[in-house]
Design a protein with these regions (language model features):
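Canonical Radical SAM [4Fe-4S] cluster-binding loop centered on the CxxxCxxC motif
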Residues: 1-14
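A conditional alpha-helix N-cap/helix-loop micro-motif detector
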Residues: 13-14, 43, 69, 96, ...
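Short Fe-S-cluster ligation motifs
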Residues: 15-38
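Short helix-terminating capping/connector loops at secondary-structure junctions
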Residues: 26-27, 58-60, 190-193
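Radical SAM/AdoMet-radical enzyme domain recognition
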Residues: 30-33, 46-136, 140-143
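Flexible loop residues that form catalytic
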Residues: 37, 92, 147
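Short secondary-structure capping/turn micro-motifs that flank functional sites
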Residues: 40-41, 95-96, 122, 150-151
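Conserved C-terminal portion of the radical SAM core fold
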Residues: 101-195
Length: 195
């Protein structure tokens, strides 16, 4: 949740990890995503939460975390030792180089490491350049999210000239097409085909 220092499990506000575990049991969860704000802003609590969930549910309980902070690479081992399975980096300003050493450390620590970005149609060339740059990074995946127009961002989206792609989705026009284009470039590269 943005700008508040509270823990939630689904939509339930939790004061303790016991409440988080109770919620996970109630929904028969097989894993959990750790989001924010940014979980690194409460690093010790995040590490404790990872450790507690793994201890309670076992090694098969998949834990992934989202962050936009290029944290000290030495922390990667702490997250791996606590039980973090996967980390997804949101690259602020699309400045991948700031994240290189952290990404490498996470991968080397055995954490499945990837990048997750919104496909902003007005940043097409920057995103295609980023895609090329990331070829030299030690990542296992890249998630491309459709840019959504929401109550919280609609004024900014309007200023940037975005419209809804259809009446049945909150996706910005052109975002899905950009994601598919980027995906086809990655697939072509994997097969050593021109993109």
């Amino acid at each position: 949740r943005r700008d508040i220092d509270w823990m939630f499990a689904n939509e339930r506000r939790c004061e303790t990890f016991e409440e988080v575990i109770e919620e996970a049991r109630a929904m028969r969860a097989t894993g959990a995503g750790i989001t924010g704000g940014d979980p690194l802003m409460a690093k010790e609590r995040t590490l404790e939460g990872i450790s507690r969930l793994k201890s309670e549910f076992g090694p098969g309980f998949h834990l992934h975390m989202y962050t936009s902070i290029p944290f000290n690479p030495e922390l990667a081992r702490e997250f791996a030792d606590a039980g973090l399975d996967e980390i997804r980096f949101h690259l602020l300003g699309l400045d991948a180089e700031r994240y290189r050493s952290t990404i490498s450390a996470c991968s080397e620590s055995g954490i499945l490491t990837g990048v997750e970005i919104p496909c902003e149609p007005d940043r097409r060339e920057e995103l295609l350049s980023l895609l090329e740059e990331l070829r030299s990074f030690d990542i296992s995946f890249m998630n491309l999210n459709e840019l959504e127009i929401t109550v919280g961002n609609h004024e900014n989206m309007e200023l940037r000239g975005f419209n809804l792609s259809t009446e049945i989705t909150a996706g910005a026009s052109g975002s899905n097409e950009l994601a598919l284009d980027m995906k086809s470039r990655v697939n072509a590269a994997e097969q050593s085909l021109p993109d």
